[in-house]
Amino acid sequence: MSDIAEPETHAPADDQLLIFTDAAADKVRELLDGEEGGDVKLRVFITGGGCSGFQYGFTFDETVEEGDTIIEKRGVKIVVDPVSGIYLQGAEVDFSSGLEGEQFIIRNPNATTTCGCGSSFAI
């Protein structure tokens, strides 16, 4: 038996680290249907950069690191590292399809300013 604790899985709740809408989960599941391999998850993260100081990132990942939070929605697993979780607390990830095209949208209550493109923010 290993001394390393398994990553914590959160059930949907109002105080959840990251809120993932049904539309976002459905789009991720659609994208993952074309992927081959093991248990692929969507990793949502924050990096330095962009015109406002921080920017959002998305990548598919098969690994879960110690301290990561796993959020499950409609059969899709979303992974957030502890540092990104600080900046994403209470944020909502949605998916929009319209005249402007298709895009994931993050509504972050922690952001004090955002870039016009919506991919970067400041706290």
From Swiss-Prot:
Q: Name one GO cellular component term.
A: cytosol
- GO aspect biological process, one term: iron-sulfur cluster assembly
Kindly give the InterPro entries that the UniProt entry links to this protein: FeS_biogenesis, FeS_cluster_insertion, FeS_cluster_insertion_CS, FeS_cluster_insertion_RrpA, HesB-like_dom_sf
Cite the cofactor comment. Binds 1 iron-sulfur cluster per subunit.
Q: Name one Pfam family in it.
A: Fe-S_biosyn
UniProt keyword annotations, A-Z: Iron, Iron-sulfur, Metal-binding
Q: Which GO terms describe its molecular function?
A: 2 iron, 2 sulfur cluster binding; 4 iron, 4 sulfur cluster binding; iron ion binding
- Signal peptide from the UniProt entry: none
State where iron-sulfur cluster binds: C51, C115, C117
Which cofactors, if any, are listed as required? iron-sulfur cluster
Q: What does this protein do?
A: Required for insertion of 4Fe-4S clusters for at least IspG.
On subunit structure and binding partners, the annotation says: Homodimer.
The UniProt entry, under HAMAP family, shows: Fe_S_insert_ErpA (MF_01380)
Q: What family classification does the UniProt entry report for this protein?
A: Belongs to the HesB/IscA family.
The protein's name: Iron-sulfur cluster insertion protein ErpA
Species this protein is from: Halorhodospira halophila (strain DSM 244 / SL1)
